[in-house]
Amino acid sequence: MSIVEYAFFQNAIIGSLLASIACGFIGTYIVSRRLVFISGGITHASFGGIGIGVYLGINPILSAMAYAVASAFGVQWMSRSVKVREDSAIALFWTFGMSVGILCSFLTPGFMPDLPSFLFGSILTISHADIVLLAAVTAVVATVFTLFYRTILSISFDNTFARSQHLPVSVMEYLLMALIAMTIVSTLRLVGIVLAMSLLTVPQMTANLFTFSFRRIIAASIAIGWADCLAGLAISYWLNVPSGAAIIFASIVIYAALRTIKSAVRKFK
């Protein structure tokens, strides 16, 4: 029986496609706005929501999503309204989320069998419910970017100009922060907390080798991201290693190879 005939692998392929689409949109905004550190903070802060979910006996992905959105809003509010340095606000929510997650993990009776999959990702843990959640998040992200593309483009490259044009910058920033948090949490089953940030940045870096157009980077990063995921899933299956690490390893190797090829071609022109 071929591996692609197994339901868990089909879920992984579908999930990786949906994750690539969502991360293609959101990751391009993150890289353009230089919000990589914020996305890393939200990713690790979401561990607090996972711990709370496990401790209370509720769906840890849903509790992590709520916690991640709250953390994203907290960072945005502290850096804009309270005038706390953005990196300090990120560090605050990052470390607090991790501490809450660790405390809840130790206070939960018994053993947390899903903990490694949340940290490192696993194709075996992607369920139909995870696919539905990913599909919903992807649909919301794609809809928002389609409806507000010009506003998002203006905010991404020139926040001051966007405000001068009376665009709803603050509202859009909070909305995009929520979408960043939702996208991150919805991909945790695939790549895990430790490596989720790379799925939002490496495909965009690879696409940026060939184009500087915001729209084209989105399209290219979706295709590159899915190729990275498929290569990583194959490595994960053949070597029996965590899918998250395999996907990110494959994505960085592909990026390095393409960058080397581009440099070599340019050198010998």
Language-model region placement:
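Membrane-interfacial amphipathic/re-entrant helices at transmembrane-helix boundaries
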Residues: 1-21, 269
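Transmembrane helix-bundle core of multi-pass membrane transporters
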Residues: 6-11, 82, 90-150
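Hydrophobic alpha-helical transmembrane segments
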Residues: 13-18, 61-66, 91-92, 131-136, ...
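Alpha-helical transmembrane segments in multi-pass membrane proteins
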Residues: 15-24, 45, 49, 53, ...
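Helix-loop-helix "hairpin" substructures at the membrane interface of multi-pass membrane proteins
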Residues: 19, 130-203
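Short loop segments and helix-boundary regions at transmembrane helix junctions
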Residues: 28-111, 207-219, 236-239, 263-264
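Transmembrane alpha-helical segments in multi-pass inner-membrane proteins
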Residues: 190, 194-245
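Cytosolic-side transmembrane-helix boundaries in multi-pass membrane proteins
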Residues: 241-248, 252-269
